Amino acid sequence: MDLFPILVVVLMTDTVLGKFQIVFPDQNELEWRPVVGDSRHCPQSSEMQFDGSRSQTILTGKAPVGITPSKSDGFICHAAKWVTTCDFRWYGPKYITHSIHHLRPTTSDCETALQRYKDGSLINLGFPPESCGYATVTDSEAMLVQVTPHHVGVDDYRGHWIDPLFPGGECSTNFCDTVHNSSVWIPKSQKTDICAQSFKNIKMTASYPSEGALVSDRFAFHSAYHPNMPGSTVCIMDFCEQKGLRFTNGEWMGLNVEQSIREKKISAIFPNCVAGTEIRATLESEGARTLTWETQRMLDYSLCQNTWDKVSRKEPLSPLDLSYLSPRAPGKGMAYTVINGTLHSAHAKYIRTWIDYGEMKEIKGGRGEYSKAPELLWSQWFDFGPFKIGPNGLLHTGKTFKFPLYLIGAGIIDEDLHELDEAAPIDHPQMPDAKSVLPEDEEIFFGDTGVSKNPIELIQGWFSNWRESVMAIVGIVLLIVVTFLAIKTVRVLNCLWRPRKKRIVRQEVDVESRLNHFEMRGFPEYVKR
């Protein structure tokens, strides 16, 4: 099935008076960090589109903006067993290899390493020196714990940490497991009272039919930071001693529920939330449920997972591939780019943004509202082949700026969007350090290294490299032959160099004995002669 006709329908953006509405980070620069292997986050799909002829009312309310910004400082604690293996063959050669093994750090390991990191005394000693024993395979081991800064997102309503690196996308403790079994995440500061945070004024647009009864099923809501959300599941809920609306995506906004929409109070339109209802702001917020939207979600998800498959296979990526990882709706999400051949990610808040077209000479647009004056959208660029790259495949060719996702949505693609560059993840958090301390002619690999003194494994090791084994056997045979010839040569020379007198004495003794023998046999005459 050809995906491009579908993409034209799926990715078409809203057009207002010749301008495109897209979603884009609300900051010009982000905090980037390398993507570790096993990360496969895919964003929520495009928002539902509602009838634009409906009446609209602007509701002014407040939403929490977090005790911290949209990201939180913290550290990833990596632990690994660094192994130097010496394979000392019985016939002489030594084979030295190095490997790094996954090892889950303990709380005490990370606390000690973090304190050393803050003191500036945390160092990487590298691989231990080899220890070799004849005809055996010997491992020298060293446990290394490293700490690296890592920002995560924050759920403003529950205080949970959110990041694709966490199993399930979130963590509520101060010692968080990650999808990488040799790494854990530790926050820089402890969580405080969630209600002590500040609340930001937000304008939420409520749309509804111009005629007919006002019931919750006929409402829809959206803002600069929120996708279009149906009102069927909206309910009234208290948060931090304030009344407000809990929306379909799980988020909440405080407002006066006694104000009216078309002479009907909000409290009379929407029901109270049932006991136990949770409000949340994660990377996986819920959305509307319709057949068309679900089909779109499946297509978006398959394109996103196809990009992650390429990342797992360490294939080069194009700007178009990166664009499939970007969110399609406003709100919290992840951004991706390529830095020095390595895939990086960052937490971002996506806001509705209006641009002139998918390809522009200046990277400017209106953030939040269509009527806002254009402003600079992005200023952080990284090398990508002959071009520069920003978030989610945004390409700077030197002459123009291209948004791949929105160009292909309009059926416009060119060779620039297919420019390839390396964008591999980090296989192991300590691999870059290993390469910096290991000679280039040595080998780094994962898995079990070294064997015990099992004789079967030992013999198998002898013939692991048949060319060297054959040469060694030939050398041993030649050594035996040369040794044998040397011994024979010494014996022959020894015989040749013995004095002649000894042989004469033997002959005289032999003649005398023969004469005595004849005399005893009765031949004296013969003896006298």
Swiss-Prot record:
Virion surface-facing ranges: 19-469
Superkingdom of the organism of origin: Viruses
Spans traversing the lipid bilayer: 470-490
Region (Trimerization): 259-313, 388-410
Upper taxonomic lineage: Viruses, Riboviria, Orthornavirae, Negarnaviricota, Haploviricotina
Protein name (record): Glycoprotein
One Gene Ontology CC term in the entry: virion membrane
Subcellular localization, as worded in the UniProt entry: Virion membrane; Host membrane
Family statement drawn from the similarity comment of this UniProt entry: Belongs to the vesiculovirus glycoprotein family.
Organism: Piry virus
Stated role: Attaches the virus to host receptors, inducing clathrin-dependent endocytosis of the virion. In the endosome, the acidic pH induces conformational changes in the glycoprotein trimer, which trigger fusion between virus and endosomal membrane.
KW Translocase (keyword) present: no
Topology Intravirion: residue spans: 491-529
